[in-house]
């Protein structure tokens, strides 16, 4: 054993001060795997092509030897390419539900803008009614009648 921290600390240092909910959600979003844990539990045998003890996700065992995903060299049919919203698809941009969803977002932004405008008007009205004082702390005549 060497002196100092563990190997995991050297590979992935922890920054407790900068960990926020935003970084947590980003980390959770980009570290999720395709296979669900419940699906792996039901198909978790060498015959079913599931993960074995000592086998990493990429098919390598913990000692670096390549292990087949399924018996006979057949690829696992459960493993699918799931690209979600990252795949560019021009046909989806003009579809009905997506356009409606965008219109809903635009309507929400318009409502927010209307609220912002009313807040600005209130602020303007309040500032117009403020009385001016001179240096001797006497209230001067209001400029607005």
Swiss-Prot record:
Keywords: Cytoplasm, Lipoprotein, Membrane, Myristate, Palmitate, Synapse, Synaptosome
Lipidation (N-myristoyl glycine): 2
GO cellular component: cytoplasm; cytosol; membrane raft; neuron projection; nucleoplasm; postsynaptic density; sarcoplasm
Location relative to the cell: Cytoplasm; Synapse, Synaptosome; Membrane raft; Postsynaptic density
Coiled-coil boundaries: none
Tissue/organ expression: At the mRNA level, predominantly expressed in the brain. At the protein level, mainly expressed in muscle tissues. In skeletal muscles, expressed in cranial and facial muscles, muscles of the neck, back, thoracic wall, and thigh. Also found in the contractile myoepithelial cell layer of salivary glands.
Pfam families registered for this protein in UniProt: BAALC_N
InterPro entries listed in its UniProt record: BAALC
Chain intervals for the UniProt region annotation (Disordered): 36-56, 87-109
Annotated segments matching region Interaction with CAMK2A: 3-35
Keyword Lipoprotein recorded: yes
Post-translation changes: Palmitoylation and myristoylation target the protein to the lipid rafts.
Ranges of compositional bias, category Polar residues: 87-105
Keyword match Transcription regulation: no
Lipid-modified residues, S-palmitoyl cysteine kind: 3
Chief localization: cytoplasm
Record text on subunit structure and interactions: Interacts with CAMK2A.
Annotated function: May play a synaptic role at the postsynaptic lipid rafts possibly through interaction with CAMK2A.
UniProt name for this protein: Brain and acute leukemia cytoplasmic protein
Organism: Mus musculus
Gene designation per UniProt: Baalc
